[in-house]
Amino acid sequence: MKKMTAMLFSMAVGLNAVSMTAMADAPKEQETDVLLIGGGIMSATLGTYLQELQPDWSMTMVERLDGVAKESSNGWNNAGTGHSALMELNYTPQKKDGSISIEKAVEINEAFQVSRQFWSHQVNSGVMHDPHSFINTVPHMSFVWGDQNVNFLRARYAALQQSSLFRGMKFSEDHAQIKEWAPLVMEGRDPNQKVAATRTEIGTDVNYGEITHQLVASLQKKDDFHLQLSTEVRGFKRNADNSWSVTVADLKNNEAEHVIKAKFVFIGAGGAALKLLQETGIPEADDYAGFPVGGQFLVSENPEVVNRHLAKVYGQASVGAPPMSVPHIDTRMLDGKRVVLFGPFATFSTKFLKNGSLWDLLSSTTTSNFMPMVDVGMDNFDLVKYLMSQVMLSDDDRFAALQEYYPQAKKEDWRLWQAGQRVQIIKRDPKEGGVLRLGTEVVSDKEGTIAALLGASPGASTAAPIMLHLMEKVFKDKVASPEWQAKLKTIIPSYGTKLNGNVAATEQELEFTSRVLQLKYEKPQTAAAAPQAQPQLKPQPDAKPVADIAL
């Protein structure tokens, strides 16, 4: 009997030891109200909103790299444009009847005003500081040559005068005037070449990486906010109460895993968002695929170049190129100094992130999105040809493209820089099989417990309105509450209204945000006279336009 008792006791001890070992090996669990995946501007913006709207919510941000804003949000990995359609010709397409559509331009400009208000509120609240470290006044210009393009720009300028958001824009076809605006663009140019330009003084250059750093630094001051760097998401599990258990690995601690249990999860991981969304298993993810495109820029830091160019000058996309691929020569403020960038030139890699894996594209291809990808490739062969031609460009080809915008450029003043990756959205379509979608898209489950941001353009410049839209989608009841409504109108004074068409409101908003963000702004005295719009633009032929992509 004693032997039997001893044996049973030994078995119990052994089983308990095994159980204790299993418990020790099981991933530890931490709890949080909100889990932000990705340390870029989108997660930082959403976290900043929620910290003010619902300060009792705990938040955790995880980032795979060893610091925030090291991918697409980094200033060197994007164009740094405060996209407001002041110069981007792709936002004002020509209709079949020859007229100019300004609807998208108005939408983009309205969205950027929301971002300006959001950043202004953060400066006034002490969340952000030293506006010149992240936003600076840089005039925005459109520049074209040739009769057809000049006529288009003239008609575009006239059409934009219908909107209060574009007051103060100037138009010129005079070589001397344009040379005064952008000397490098005009010096050495054929004096008989027909050219035209528009210029808006209130354009901006924005360092989205610096904005991200400042927002996250402020969030870290809160006891219930936790930042976990070098932390990779490994899996998702939906719980019975609709919360999520997300397994993550500590890449600096032998990839030790632990579980984060969150009531709401935001996937703001840039190019990696699609793959992570697929891993959640929500049916909404089945509608999407992604196609990665990279971008390169020529960079000059030579003071003789940099000090003689103070503008962002956008051109017209060449025939057969996507509208978004417009070349531009830009003043940038990076690492505390002025530089000039020209590009972009498209590149191809199967990586979804600059620091991603060559297996990203293949591993994101599923039985549900394979055919939509094939359909997009078949339907957009011009786009495929364009990307192939870009990949084949030589250094001489890129320099020749630069000389179209800077005729007296010298090769020794420029170096090539590889910027970030942009994953284009491909969405399943019942009629066409699959369509290429420009822009960003919020994808969430029907319960509103998890959401991801897919897409690339206009991206960071509209982070504030995009995250506002996300909250309206997943926190619908909260957003409708009097408490959140009051706070949202404090953060975004124009919330719930449109500035377009209201001159007084537009000027009030621009004056306020310019003062807080230390930007230049002079109220237009009178609406600029539209130039003679003859000859009229000819109706567009029934040709299929090249699909657009973000670079």
UniProtKB/Swiss-Prot annotation:
Species of the source: Enterobacter sp. (strain 638)
UniProt-annotated stretches for the region Disordered: 525-551
The name this protein goes by in its record: Probable malate:quinone oxidoreductase
Reaction(s) catalysed by this chain's protein: (S)-malate + a quinone = a quinol + oxaloacetate
Gene Ontology molecular function, alphabetical: 2-hydroxyglutarate dehydrogenase activity; L-malate dehydrogenase (quinone) activity
Membrane-spanning segments: none
Keywords, ordered alphabetically: FAD, Flavoprotein, Oxidoreductase, Tricarboxylic acid cycle
Compositionally biased residues, Low complexity: 525-544
PANTHER family: L-2-HYDROXYGLUTARATE DEHYDROGENASE, MITOCHONDRIAL
Organism domain of life: Bacteria
NCBIfam families: mal_quin_oxido, PRK05257.1-1, PRK05257.1-4, PRK05257.2-1, PRK05257.3-2, PRK13339.1
Top-rank EC class of the record's enzyme: oxidoreductase
Biological process according to GO: tricarboxylic acid cycle
InterPro entries: FAD/NAD-bd_sf, MQO
Cofactor: FAD
Family to which the UniProt record says this protein belongs: Belongs to the MQO family.
Lineage, uppermost ranks: Bacteria, Pseudomonadati, Pseudomonadota, Gammaproteobacteria, Enterobacterales
EC number: 1.1.5.4
Keyword Lyase attributed: no
Pathway entry: Carbohydrate metabolism; tricarboxylic acid cycle; oxaloacetate from (S)-malate (quinone route): step 1/1
